[in-house]
């Protein structure tokens, strides 16, 4: 077996599997204009019945996937606003649905979770490459790297403001 092939059959990490599961749920919900929680419940049932459309998840991965879905539901409007500000020269209508949903999922994690940015971005790029077009991985990487930098700059600015306020 070649190195590339060995790498391809290695098990997917819990968080990455959960992200891929949620990506599929998000894609299906958007495509069918259905509530995210309804599609998640249906996907969870299909997974438990052995439907290979949705990857099998461990209990920990399913818990993480559920947290992602709840967060996406709660913060969807803010996530879309952030993406509209971040992506220059593209409207949501011009973007592939695959790319947009990968970006939504990763943007939620970058803004609303304590996950380190590099693994979130790496997972998003892998999902984009797996399900998107030829340039999806590069596009997603560029958008998320820019967003990560701006969030880190804003975090530094906020930390500086809090330190100045505390000294007063």
Curated annotation (Swiss-Prot):
In terms of CDD domains, this protein maps to:
Terminator_NusB (cd00619)
The reply on keyword Transcription regulation is: yes
Task: Enumerate the Gene Ontology biological process terms.
Answer: DNA-templated transcription termination; transcription antitermination
Gene Ontology cellular-component terms listed = cytosol
Q: Which InterPro entries match?
A: NusB-like_sf, NusB_fam, NusB_RsmB_TIM44
Top-level taxon = Bacteria
Reply yes or no: does the keyword Aminoacyl-tRNA synthetase apply.
Answer: no
Cite the entry's keywords alphabetically: RNA-binding, Transcription, Transcription antitermination, Transcription regulation
What's a Pfam family in this record? NusB
Q: Name one GO molecular function term.
A: RNA binding
NCBIfam families cross-referenced by the UniProt entry: nusB (TIGR01951)
Q: What does this protein do?
A: Involved in transcription antitermination. Required for transcription of ribosomal RNA (rRNA) genes. Binds specifically to the boxA antiterminator sequence of the ribosomal RNA (rrn) operons.
According to its UniProt record, which protein family does this protein belong to?
Belongs to the NusB family.
PANTHER family annotated for this entry? ANTITERMINATION NUSB DOMAIN-CONTAINING PROTEIN (PTHR11078:SF3), N UTILIZATION SUBSTANCE PROTEIN B-RELATED (PTHR11078)
Identify this protein by name. Transcription antitermination protein NusB
């Amino acid at each position: 077996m070649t190195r590339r092939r060995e790498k391809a059959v290695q098990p997917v990490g819990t968080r990455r599997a959960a992200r891929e599961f949620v990506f599929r749920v998000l894609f299906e919900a958007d495509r069918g204009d259905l509530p995210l929680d309804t599609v998640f419940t249906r996907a969870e049932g299909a997974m438990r019945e052995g439907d290979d459309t949705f990857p099998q998840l461990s209990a920990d991965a399913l818990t993480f996937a559920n947290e992602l879905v709840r967060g996406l539901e709660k913060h969807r409007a803010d996530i879309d606003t952030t993406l509209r500000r971040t992506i220059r020269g593209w409207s949501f209508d011009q973007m592939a649905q695959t790319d947009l949903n990968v970006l939504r999922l990763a943007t939620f994690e970058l803004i609303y979770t304590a996950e380190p940015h590099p693994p979130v971005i790496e997972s998003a790029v892998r999902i984009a490459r797996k399900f998107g077009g030829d340039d999806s991985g590069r596009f997603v990487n560029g958008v998320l790297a820019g967003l990560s930098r701006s969030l880190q700059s804003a975090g530094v600015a906020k930390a500086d403001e809090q330190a100045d306020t505390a000294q007063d």
